[in-house]
Structure formats: structure tokens, C-alpha cells
Amino acid sequence: EVMMRGTFANIRIRNEMAPGTEGGFTKLYPEEKVMPVYDAVVEYKKRGTDLVVIGGKEYGTGSSRDWAAKGTKLLGVKAVLAESFERIHRSNLIGMGVLPLQFVGDMNRENLNLKGSELISIIDIEKGINPRDEVEVEFKYQSGDIKKIKMLCRIDTKNELEYYKNGGILQYVLRNMI
């Protein structure tokens, strides 16, 4: 629980969903209540809501990258959608079973007008993916509008794909030992 509470709690983090706050705060939807990330995660888990993280450029840059990926997984995040990824953190996310997806071209969270209230679906992911596939992602806005875009799957190698398919590198190793 300590590591989960510490994930996304760095005071340099600015969550655009919770303007005026520093560190580990987010907004719980549909209530639009600003609260600690951990508390929001607990509530979303009770509701059965899967989570994604939306990031900017060089997502994951920092000194505690391995724990950043572990904490992200422990919080129940299924995917990270970002403009670009720090190389090692991208690999660590996959090693934890979290899907890294990269915006293509000039597409980003700003020109999609993402506020945090959108329902996000990764279309046909259950049918399987290959390294560096284009993946369709659907954003359903509170207004009812729907926007679909293509994103680049940042699982770059066949080995990484096997780790992801198994839920992470530890699960992959354990399954291959049995």
C-alpha cells in the first residue's frame, strides 16, 4: 500500500485533471471531486473501472523508473497513452504488463481535448497485437461524442509481446518454469 500511495505522488507532477494541485492528486468522475490518486483508484476499483494514464512527451523520465512501472501496475492501470516514452520506462511498463501506446503524428491529449472524464476503449485488443502495430483507440466524451484514432503500440519486440501477453515478465518466467 505504501508503494501504491507513493505512485504519482512526486511534487513535480502536475495532473492536468486537477489544476492547482501538486503531486498525487486526480479528479474522480463523474463526481468531479479532486482527491488523492490512491483514494480515486480504490473507488474506481470498487466500481470495476479499468484505468489508463494519459501522458505527454518522454513519459516516465526520472530516477525511480522501475518502481514507477510497478506502482502503475499495482494501481490497476491497463495502458499508458503518451506522446513519447522514456526508453527504459517503456520497457518496464511492458515488464509489468502495462500496455504503452503512443500518439501518432501531431495527435495528443491537447488536440483531443481530453479532460479525464472520457471513457477510453482500446478496440479489438483481445484479438491480439503484434510489435509496433497500429491500434485503434476510442474516446467517448461526456457529451456523447466519439472520436477514434490510431495509436502506435510501443511493444517493440516479440519478447516484449510475450511478456505483455503473460501479464508481465515475472508471470512469463513462472509460466515457463512450470
Task: Please state what every model-predicted region is.
Residues 1-178:
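Fe-S-dependent hydro-lyases/dehydratases of central metabolism
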